Amino acid sequence: MSKRLAIVVVLVTLFLGTKPQSAWCQGYGTDTQNVMTPAAGGMAGVSVARPQDVPSAIFGNPATLAQFNGTQFTLGGGWVEGYPTVKNDGSANTTDNTPFSVTSRSEGFVVPAMGVTQDLRSLGLNGTLGLGLSGTSGLGAEYRGRVPESNILNNTSGEYMVLGMNVGAGFQLTDKFSVGAALTLGTAFEQLGLVGPAVSSAMVNDYGLRGNFGLNYDLNEANTVGAYYQTRMDFAFPDAVRIGSDYHDVRISQPETVGLGYANRSFMNGDLLLAADVYYKMWESAPLWEDIFVNQWAFAVGSQLTRGKMKYRLGYSYNTNPINHNVGNSLDGFPYAQANVQLFQAASTAVINQHRLTAGIGRQGFLIPNLDLDLYAGGLFNASDMFGTHTEASVAIYYVGMGLTWRYGDCCRSPQ
C-alpha cells in the first residue's frame, strides 16, 4: 500500500512540475476564480458559501476557512487547452488585402492548486489558518509566421500569467457567523505581443498584493450564505514596451471582485449539496483591461451527491461577455489605431466564452483512510464574436484536473 501511495505522490508531483506553456484563460475574463480546484472544478467553481476543497476556501471566501477542522493538505492541479482562431478580411494588412484565418499554436499549461489548513482551536482560537499556491490568472496566444507578412499578427506572440500565494484565516465569531481575511502575493509574467507603435520588449515580471475579506452565515442547519470582496491586484511591468528608442512601463491590474454564495444541504438526508455563486468583476477600473473589457457578471450552480465514500459532482456557469465593442484608440495610454486595438482583442484577449459545463468525482479513503482523491473535467462551449467590422475570433476551452487531500485530526471527511 505504501508503494502505491508513493507512486501516486510522484506522479502528481511530476504533473505539477511540468513547465507551463502559454494557452488561454478558462475562468471569467483573465481570472480563474476557483474553476480548477480539485472539488470545485467539478462544480463550475462554486465555493463561496461551502467550499468542498482546501484551495477553494483559501483562494475564495476566507471566512469559510473556519469550516475546516484538524489539519488538511491538498496537492492538486489541472491542464487547460484553448486554441483561438482569428479571421480578418485583409483590411488589417498594410500592403495588401489578402484575407486570412489563423489558429494559435500555443500549447496547454498546468494550473496548480495547492493548500494547507490548520485548525487553531487547540490554541484557544476558534478558527483556521490557511496557506496556498495557485494559478490565479492567465492567457496567451502565438501566430508568428502564419499570416500575411504585412499584418502585425505575423510577429505576435503573447503571454500573461499570474501565480498567487495566499495566506488567510477564518474565525467563528458565533455558532452561525464567521469572518475571514486573506492576503495574496502575486507574481506575474507579461509579454502581450504588442506590435507598433508600442512594441513589446521582452517577457518581464512584477509582483502585486491583493486583499480578500469575507463573511459566512448559517441561516439554519441546512442553509448557508457567504460573501467576499477582493481588492484590485496591481502590476507595473518595467520597460515592457518600446516606442522608438525609449522604453516604458505597462500597467495591468486584476479587477476588484465581489462574490456572493448560497448552499443548501436539506435534501437526501444531507447527502445532496446544492450551491450557487454570483460574481461581479470590475474590469472598467483595472488598468489595461479597462481599455478592452467591460464589467462582468458571472453565475454558477453546482451539486455534489455523496454515496458512501463516493462523491459525484456537476456544475454549470454562465457569464456575460466582457468584451468592449466600443474601444478607443489606446492601450494603457499608448496610442493605437482602433482597428489594431480590435485585432489585439481578437487575437490575444478574446475571453468570449459564456457557457461552462463541468463534472467531477471524489473518493474518500483512497489507498489509505485519511487520503481523498478528486478528479474533474470541464469545458467552455465554442463561441465567436466580431471585433469591429473586419475581424472575428472563435475559441473553445477544455480542462481536466485532480487533487489528493490528506486529512488529520478532527476531520474524517471534507466539509458538506
Locate the predicted segments by residue.
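Short, solvent-exposed beta-strand-terminating loops
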Residues: 75-88, 188, 234, 321-327
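Outer membrane beta-barrel transmembrane domains
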Residues: 29, 96, 205, 209-416
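Solvent-exposed, glycine/polar-rich loop segments of beta-barrel outer-membrane systems
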Residues: 90-100, 149-152, 194-202, 239-249, ...
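C-terminal segment of classical bacterial N-terminal signal peptides
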Residues: 14-23
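Sec-dependent N-terminal signal peptides
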Residues: 5-14
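Transmembrane beta-barrel wall of Gram-negative outer-membrane proteins
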Residues: 101-230
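N-terminal, post-signal peptide beta-strand-biased segments of exported outer-membrane/organellar beta-barrel
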Residues: 22-129, 133, 340, 347-352
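N-terminal secretory signal peptides that target proteins for export/translocation
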Residues: 1-3
